[in-house]
Amino acid sequence: MKALTILGLVLLSVTVQGKIFERCELARTLKKLGLDGYKGVSLANWVCLAKWESGYNTEATNYNPGDESTDYGIFQINSRYWCNNGKTPGAVDACHISCSALLQNNIADAVACAKRVVSDPQGIRAWVAWRNHCQNKDVSQYVKGCGV
């Protein structure tokens, strides 16, 4: 029985591998990936968005029972419109990407899809967490001291 418990803990530690970025580490990464000022959205707004959507966690997921969709990754990109998880009824997959790609520690795919999302008419307002926590707020604190 003890061996099964240890095996279970080992398997659990293997499956929970999401990277949780430090604030400044994320700011520098997003800047390198071209998000600073992309479609007029400041780097501070992107970092604020990631803070409130996922807590900077690349492996965050959130199931939405109302429309049977799931939000994925550091930006909580939704499977109804943006990615394909093979489960969401009527999914559009506008980013032409597997939702699992949005859970990688390397966030290049997530950033590419976020650029696609923000290019739509709704822009960054597509994210509820941004509207609730970042819009019309002083978001400079999210990049303060980061050297970006």
UniProtKB/Swiss-Prot annotation:
Transmembrane segments: none annotated. One of its GO terms (molecular function) is lysozyme activity. GO terms for cellular component: extracellular region. Its main location: secreted. GO terms for biological process: defense response to Gram-negative bacterium; defense response to Gram-positive bacterium; digestion; killing of cells of another organism. It catalyses: Hydrolysis of (1->4)-beta-linkages between N-acetylmuramic acid and N-acetyl-D-glucosamine residues in a peptidoglycan and between N-acetyl-D-glucosamine residues in chitodextrins. Residues 19-148 form the C-type lysozyme domain. The active site is at E53, D71. Its EC number is 3.2.1.17. Disulfide bonds join C24-C146, C48-C134, C83-C99, C95-C113. Residues 1-18 form the signal peptide. Keywords: Antimicrobial, Bacteriolytic enzyme, Digestion, Disulfide bond, Glycosidase, Hydrolase, Secreted, Signal. InterPro entries: Glyco_hydro_22 (IPR001916), Glyco_hydro_22_CS (IPR019799), Glyco_hydro_22_lys (IPR000974), Lysozyme-like_dom_sf (IPR023346). PROSITE patterns: GLYCOSYL_HYDROL_F22_1 (PS00128), GLYCOSYL_HYDROL_F22_2 (PS51348). It comes from the Eukaryota. Monomer. PANTHER family: LYSOZYME C. Belongs to the glycosyl hydrolase 22 family. Lysozymes have primarily a bacteriolytic function; those in tissues and body fluids are associated with the monocyte-macrophage system and enhance the activity of immunoagents. Also plays a role in digestion in this species. This is Lysozyme C. It comes from Semnopithecus entellus. The lineage of its organism: Eukaryota, Metazoa, Chordata, Craniata, Vertebrata. The gene is LYZ.
